[in-house]
């Protein structure tokens, strides 16, 4: 039986992880849950799952949760702050960490799980975007097992030889006859919208993704295709891929989740309904297969597959991310920080939809791109880029 800590338990990935665990109670035990500020949702989860520990990033939320648990006579121990999140990721009594905290906030607790030698189910793409080679090196140094959860990276993972699956970040694609990884994306809700109309897109329009059910931040990232840009960076590190070995292609139906092209002309694709419980179940049970609670794919109802090259004039954030990926670790760290601030400002109606890419580019051009040597320098640059982004937003808001 796998014993789990779920980082980001109250979010979309956390909910899907718990759904898979509920589908297979004989295989998974939830030992610890962690979240940010939603103490009421965490109370509900504690009532259902009765974890030994619950960690809240917000000190105030941790206090609220303690009061609520005592009131409902639930014995779950409450931990608080970054230290609490890191503690539940490194518990002796767990072997698996679902790393699903959105954004830079997930880096430290995910790295705590790595340093404790856990099996890391990586849904927090920002951890690799921010720390890249440091993260891969830490997995090797501490004996952590890294399994991708993002639907695209999990799809690629499933199409790769077993030797590569066991050596995430340290493989040689050329050695195994792999010529290219094809990273698919739906193109978001505005792939056919007139480019001139994108400036008037509202937050409500941006979070209405046509295929996937996701949180607001990731939905906006999907609309700008920054999400695909971050996934591109993550794929570069997970699969040790060169620029020539990675290609983004738009596939509006979201049925083929990604593909791997081999030297002999073969292309392996992973397909399924757009439901995160499938890649989550794959990572949770690897190398076995379990019931994910997802309906099987009915090919007679799909109709057709469509593939399009990305239009960078429509998706400038995607181009920024691809370029930053090979400009060095500092560039991707700064871009991720700027994008988090810009998306939050857009969701708060402080800036327009097309301003997100403008702010991201300005940060890439103005942040101090010194060499990052450790996590402290990563976090320092992350904070610097956020301050710069806030200052730019104040001027345009």
UniProtKB/Swiss-Prot annotation:
Task: List its EC numbers.
Answer: 1.1.1.267
Q: Membrane spanning segments where?
A: none
Cofactor(s) needed by this chain: Mg(2+); Mn(2+)
Q: Where does 1-deoxy-D-xylulose 5-phosphate bind?
A: 125, 151-152, 186, 209, 222, 227-228, 231
Tell me which UniProt keywords the record has, alphabetically: Isoprene biosynthesis, Manganese, Metal-binding, NADP, Oxidoreductase
Q: In which pathway does it act?
A: Isoprenoid biosynthesis; isopentenyl diphosphate biosynthesis via DXP pathway; isopentenyl diphosphate from 1-deoxy-D-xylulose 5-phosphate: step 1/6
Might you name a Gene Ontology BP term for this protein? Answer: isopentenyl diphosphate biosynthetic process, methylerythritol 4-phosphate pathway involved in terpenoid biosynthetic process
Which chemical reaction does it catalyze? 2-C-methyl-D-erythritol 4-phosphate + NADP(+) = 1-deoxy-D-xylulose 5-phosphate + NADPH + H(+)
A Pfam match is: DXP_reductoisom
Q: Where does Mn(2+) bind?
A: 150, 152, 231
What is the superkingdom listed in this entry's lineage?
Answer: Bacteria
From the UniProt record, which GO molecular function terms apply?
A: 1-deoxy-D-xylulose-5-phosphate reductoisomerase activity; manganese ion binding; NADPH binding
- Output the HAMAP family linked to this UniProt entry: DXP_reductoisom
Q: What does this protein do?
A: Catalyzes the NADPH-dependent rearrangement and reduction of 1-deoxy-D-xylulose-5-phosphate (DXP) to 2-C-methyl-D-erythritol 4-phosphate (MEP).
- Provide the family line: Belongs to the DXR family.
Name it. Answer: 1-deoxy-D-xylulose 5-phosphate reductoisomerase
Species of origin:
Photobacterium profundum (strain SS9)
Q: What is the lineage of its organism?
A: Bacteria, Pseudomonadati, Pseudomonadota, Gammaproteobacteria, Vibrionales
